[in-house]
Amino acid sequence: LDMLHMAFSRLKEDKSPGLDGQSVGDYRENLEPNLQDLLQRIHRGSYRPQPCLRRDIPKENGKTRPLGLACVEDKIVQRTLVMILERIYEVDFYDNSYGYRPGKSCHQALGELGKVIATRRVDWISDAD
């Protein structure tokens, strides 16, 4: 239950609700019973993630990109799983791996890249997404 509380506390209030229409604020109104119920469903194996609400977000080039908006409970479960997996695998990651890591950022990655380019011969750079 503590991890579900931690996961909930990391959710952003201003994000759009998912398919169920429930906001983080709505979920907070009955937080303790909601988290207890969620935990019981996880333990029983009856928790099922909901479909994401699909929104098309306009891009600068005039096209759109699809965005899936998860409901609050799914975000809580996803965040809890991230916290568990980070504890397990963080020790195995390379120090120069910056993507989606706690305490690491794209700005730090760019700074490190700048140092490498300035101090070593670089024959190629790969740009990947």
Over which residues does each language-model region extend?
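Conserved pre-catalytic core of RNA-dependent polymerases
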Residues: 1-128
